[in-house]
Amino acid sequence: MAIDLSSANTFDERHLGPTDADVDAMLDALGAESLDALVDAAIPDSIRTDVPLDLPSALTEQQVLDAAQDAGAKNDTWRSFIGMGYRHTHTPPVIQRNILENPAWYTQYTPYQAEIAQGRLEALLNFQDMTIDLTGLEIANASLLDEATAAAEAMMMLNRVDRRSDAATFYVSEDCHPQTIEVVKGRAEPIGIDVIVESPENFVFGEDTFGCLLQYPTTDGAVHDYRDVADRAHEADAYVAVAADLLSLTLLEAPGEWGADAVVGSTQRFGVPMGYGGPHAAYFATRERFQRQVPGRMIGVTKDADGEMALRMALQTREQHIRRGRATSNICTSQVLLAVMASMYAVYHGPEGLREIATRVHDLTKTLAEGLDRTGHTVRHDAYFDTLRVDLTDATQAQVRERAEAHEINLRYYDDGSVGVALDQTVDAEDLDALFTVFGATNGQKLYAEDLAADLDSGYDGPMPRQTSYLEHPVFNSYHSEGELTRYMKSLADKDLSLVHSMIPLGSCTMKLNPTAALQPISNPQFAGLHPFAPQEQAAGYEQVIDELSGYLTEITGFDDISFQPNSGASGEYTGLLIIQAYHEARGEEQRDVCLVPESAHGTNPASANMAGMEVITIDCDENGDVDLDDLREQAEANSERLAAAMITYPSTHGVFEEHVEEICDVIHEHGGQVYLDGANVNAQVGLCRPREYGVDVCHLNLHKTFSIPHGGGGPGVGPVCTAEHLSPFLPGHPVVETGGDQHIPAIAAAPHGSALILLISWAYIKLLGPEGLTKSSKTALLNANYLADQLSNHYDIVFRGPNDRVAHEFILDLRPFRSELDINEQDVAKRLMDYGFHAPTMSWPVVGTLMVEPTESESKAELDRLVDAFAAIRSEIEAVETGTLEAEASTLKQAPHTAEMVTADEWDRAYSRETAAYPVEAVRERKFWPTVRRVNDAYGDRNLYCACPPTDAYEADEEEELTSALKTA
């Protein structure tokens, strides 16, 4: 045989869990002749694609890293003083290495299972406390997608809390960032809110006005005293929202103190790279009386079964997974990993450190202003924090721009000929000297920053100075050395179960392992350091990645075009529905406003449709879990003139490939509607079927599911929208960077390409696997799910099966009989799984009283068997209750989870042994994960809502009364 010089180190062998021998054993257990035979049995022939993926061949890990390095070298990372909500920042290496690059943090899931997420919950509580302190308000959430969408959420919240049915006008200051203005206007239009962009002094708070939005400081840097605006708004029963620079609030009066009812903004400059637009965590704070209207996740303090303090996600009944179309927002994924980074930045620097950073940035700005004044230019605003708008004298904007480009400096250029300069913590005296040269001296003198600074007083002395303290909690005043912070972060990580411990079999979440080689490029400063509004010629590397990834994903899905602007799957849904609306309007069919949504759909679907101004009609499912075709036809016929869209998920959320999906699409098209596919389950389709081929018009993809961007404990995510050719003209645009179709809908996110930095991960993932590896991944995902379903069916019923008695990439375990007969429910099983070292599958969705299991392709047979053993042992524990050996309340299931403190206590009065509690099967001994709190009390936490860092005496409380008292007096 001839020598083969090609590399044998293909990545699919690293990514796929089962070995060839494992595959054979699993197929044998399933009675399947081959992997292809299993796939053929699971997927209807009618939707299988006949065309293999036309993608580049797989590369090795080193080849992908080299390709990423080459692409990064094409970016020009100039010094960007553009501002507009994005700044250079120093990411402390201790945070970069121990949070951003640490799989114990980035592979976690959203902390629904609080007992095994106390570390992440504490980090997010720190984030909320930081937000509350700096904004001067009472409550905050645990992050939103970006500043612009947070401002839109604030508008919607204030509209909800306003009791006047005819109040539908919202003022937006013309001094807000342009991307914020556009996103707010775009969000308002579908739901009938009239946005008026105006100067704040001209706001007219009539009876039809429910609120306004201000920027603090303004987009061009001015610090205004807005107390009069707030007073006028409140006198008219209107509300005030403020988009504030978080670092500036260490020096400026907190908006909550001068009348703001909601404050939003970005935490990007708290140690998170710009990344050509994201991802970054937005913050959201408001008044306590609006607590049940807050969008997104909130972390709150509660107690556990022993009365000890614990943390959990609070007020979940606000959210889309419970309230569906009546939710406060469609938000699901947020920006948890970035919120953790920002909170650790505040913990690391503390209040004094943050004030020092802000003061230094302001001093640099003051020095720049002095120099510009001496050169004859005029700084437009007397009061500023770190941004100047310069009216030029004896120089044109073109001349300044030419000199700036010669020095590789980006500035902001206004239409009126003025120039903007926004400084940040990375600026030094040499940067100021370069800026003096760029602006030029009218009298020929050369200026030096150090000389100017010697004659100036340090500190902020403008209007609205901050008088109140902030970040006084011990957590912000204890970990300022690298050693202390490292240990603190490690102590939190140790409390959280992630993929470094075991598989996370969450249905519809696709918790696959994330290739390290795919994540490595995001730390490259040539990608991380780029401003999203830098000239496009400076972003050639990004343009290459975006263009190539666009081609890969359209090839995989069969669509024609794509936009990466949506920062989450829910945002992608909303975008797709707006595109459908724009399409109907362009055809003169504005009356089409009905959206058909199956009852099995993700909660984000009806929530997104409502946000898009559509009327949601729910379609029944039949006894097999499929969309009820008769009901679909009936509703489509009854609403034929108004039908805008139907939203489907494929494979269905019931874990099967419905055989009549093409017929569903045909019915909708016959009545003039468009078909939207929720791409949450595309991991079962890549290389096997293409959504466009079976009739879908538009879909979103979850790059944080199928294409291996890690979940980060609840974000970041990317939800790009893929469109058929007839919908492509309506892809979202952007007010600053040209993008989208020629009839584009407004921007739906702050940055033109959304969270561009992490697109690198999916780009690298596809390159690593190539067409054969991607297809094999889908097949292996089906194999793993069918093997698990087969093994678990010996102990539990599987609710739905598809063609030939097979499931798709996920399936539903039925626990309902145990609830009705034994008072043992899905939550009891979920908590007991923690003692076995596993995160629970998805609970009570899409069928109440069940668990939905998705193993993904990256789990080995050994890991699948560990999960089977755990479920089998739990079934035996249930049987002990069935036979009367134990009462349900005395069983391991009702008492779970068991902490180390509990099982090592001097007294043990349980009806089972300590060993049964802690080490129920032998495999647990090899890698025991200990929950750090007992079962949390959700009801107590919601009754006694507390969303900030608790006082020190709360940690010492032994009884419920002591904890309640400590929280109420804080």
Feature-to-residue mapping (PLM):
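Active-site region of PLP-dependent enzymes
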Residues: 303-338, 736-759
